[in-house]
Amino acid sequence: MASQEATSQATPQKIVVASLNPVKTGAVLEGFTRMFPGGAYQVSGVSVPSDVPDQPLSDQETLQGALNRIKNARSLEPDADFWVGVEGGVNPEGEAFQSFAWIAVESKEGRTGKARTATYYVAQETANLIGGGMELGHADDLIFGKTNSKQHSGSVGILTDDVVTRTSYYIQAVILALIPFKNTQLTFSSNKSG
């Protein structure tokens, strides 16, 4: 289990991210810190399955992967304050593929927040490999001569020359997924998982 912390005088809230990927745990820590400044957080990652294909091929499949990751992380680490699922996916559009990710957050009280990142098109060379069954990260590594790019800048970082990194790409969606937790007096339809 990997762990990162942002500390203050308060007892840290325990946040379990359903991934060991440091990009995802870092984005979650930064999102919580920006949305709730002054809080104390202990973020750890756990390896759990998404129960969807390694490369989700639709919006719904990708969202379901994020929600499944929360469920599986909660089973593994039931004593957290929050569980977060981050699932990247692609959506076919003819021969092209749009790339995006879903972020889902659930509190120990059962409140849920969900948000999707911005969407961009992957290069056709990458799309051809995805269409042949390859995962986006592996396709990018092959096309761009990288190694394990999904734990660094990711596809979005490669294509933007790190103007947008995979971490910065996720942070905004983490913040948006936290809206129901910032506005507890309001009701959001995303408060129901699934």
Region spans (language model):
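Anionic-ligand binding patches
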Residues: 54-194
